[in-house]
């Protein structure tokens, strides 16, 4: 099973890349995540935000394969505990399909991406800096895996 984090935004600060890589390398080979970075659409005072979101959505939809489980991160999504995430991870492994996790740009995900998602998750009711979401998400996936392995990291 492959987990793809499909994220809008490139050229992240070094701390984001370092944090992401630290947790990604800790995951076992069968769960090694793939980070797909998509360019952020140009935004200015004269551009329409909805057009930028739609452009990012077009790009994101091209990376969603058939017969995959797709999860969209959205402020209106469902929130849950790390323990519940660990059970979801176990279920994904049993299911065998690849998993896509969609991380939108600063203005969120295109409605077509949300419509294609099997699940919508909210990481927090707080507004999080866009780059931090990648690090937070990969850490939580690692933590969920450690729970399944009875590894002391979670304790």
Swiss-Prot record:
It catalyses: pseudouridine(1915) in 23S rRNA + S-adenosyl-L-methionine = N(3)-methylpseudouridine(1915) in 23S rRNA + S-adenosyl-L-homocysteine + H(+). Gene3D superfamilies: 3.40.1280.10. It is found in: Cytoplasm. The keyword Nucleus does not apply. It holds the Pfam family SPOUT_MTase. Keywords: Cytoplasm, Methyltransferase, rRNA processing, S-adenosyl-L-methionine, Transferase. InterPro entries: Alpha/beta_knot_MTases (IPR029028), RlmH-like (IPR003742), tRNA_m1G_MTases_N (IPR029026). It comes from the Bacteria. Its EC number is 2.1.1.177. Its main location: cytoplasm. CDD domains: RlmH-like. S-adenosyl-L-methionine binds at residues 73, 104, 123-128. GO terms for cellular component: cytoplasm. GO terms for molecular function: rRNA (pseudouridine-N3-)-methyltransferase activity. Belongs to the RNA methyltransferase RlmH family. Specifically methylates the pseudouridine at position 1915 (m3Psi1915) in 23S rRNA. Homodimer. This is Ribosomal RNA large subunit methyltransferase H. The gene is rlmH.
């Amino acid at each position: 099973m492959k987990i793809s984090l499909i994220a809008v935004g490139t050229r992240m600060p070094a701390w984001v890349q370092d944090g992401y890589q630290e947790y990604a390398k800790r995951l076992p080979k069968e769960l090694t995540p793939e980070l797909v970075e998509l360019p952020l659409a140009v935004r200015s005072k004269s551009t329409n935000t909805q057009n930028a979101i739609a452009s990012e959505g077009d790009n994101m939809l091209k990376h969603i394969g058939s017969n995959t489980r797709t999860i969209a991160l959205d402020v209106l999504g469902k929130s849950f505990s790390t323990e519940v995430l660990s059970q979801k991870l176990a279920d994904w492994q049993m299911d065998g399909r690849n998993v896509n996790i969609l991380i939108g740009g600063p203005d969120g995900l295109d409605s077509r991406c949300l419509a294609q998602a099997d699940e919508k998750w909210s990481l927090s009711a707080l507004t999080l800096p866009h780059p931090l979401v990648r690090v937070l998400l990969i850490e939580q996936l690692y933590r969920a895996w450690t729970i399944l392995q009875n590894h002391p990291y979670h304790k």
